[in-house]
Amino acid sequence: MAIKKRPDADRLPISQRIDSRMPNPGRRQMTPTEWAIKGELFLNCSCELFCPCVVSLGAHPPTEGHCHAWMAIAIDEGHFEGEDLSGLNVGLMVEIPGRMGEGGWRVAAYVDERASGKAYNGILQIFSGAAGGTTGLFTMLVSDIVGAEREKVEIVREGKKRGLYIGRKIQGEIEMITGKSEDHPVMITNSKYWMGPDIIAARGLKSKVRDYGRIWDFGGKSAEICPIDWKGPKP
């Protein structure tokens, strides 16, 4: 019986075979730089009960098996490589297929139309994870940035209510859940959650997303409010 001759390519040294493979497709790379943001983040998601991602640090599945959400970030103080970010607003549309910590996030960003060119690009670097620091984990968790655009991003913070308004694309309103003492909302404190240690529990009121082929309604669903103090990597 004739012995079948192996193709020459199969006899190449392993190192040469590896070198000759097709290159990996492009992916976001982290380029750590100097930045900082202080302010407040609030969101409304598709979970029926208070989001289990907070106390489980992303290890527990969302109540619906997936997580759809909008997020609002009010930057009270901030800068990116010397460019002032104070007073700017950012909105995000987020789609997570399973456990938060398992990645696969799809995200759209809406950046305040008042942002300068450098501020706009800096905000995108921060929220894509490329700038490193607190949000650096996004380079691992976010698989697809479906869009980024300048918009009028209106954020309202009045008493126990919060609102995010981006034209007809996102119209979200949430309200803190009142605790035993009416002066203090229900909250989780001293957590290791990535956003911040103190999370105020809230619920969605009027809350609709209509963009990028998504039609979501989070009225009555889980919401949260978190003071943030994020930074770039330590020098």
Residue spans for each PLM region:
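N-terminal ordered "arm"
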Residues: T31-G78
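Charged linear interaction tracts used for macromolecular binding and regulation
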Residues: W105-H184, T189
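Extended, charged low-complexity segments
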Residues: T178-P235
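Non-catalytic, low-structured ubiquitin/UBL-interacting segments
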Residues: I3, P23-P32
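Aromatic- and glycine-enriched beta-alpha-beta binding-site module
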Residues: G65-T135
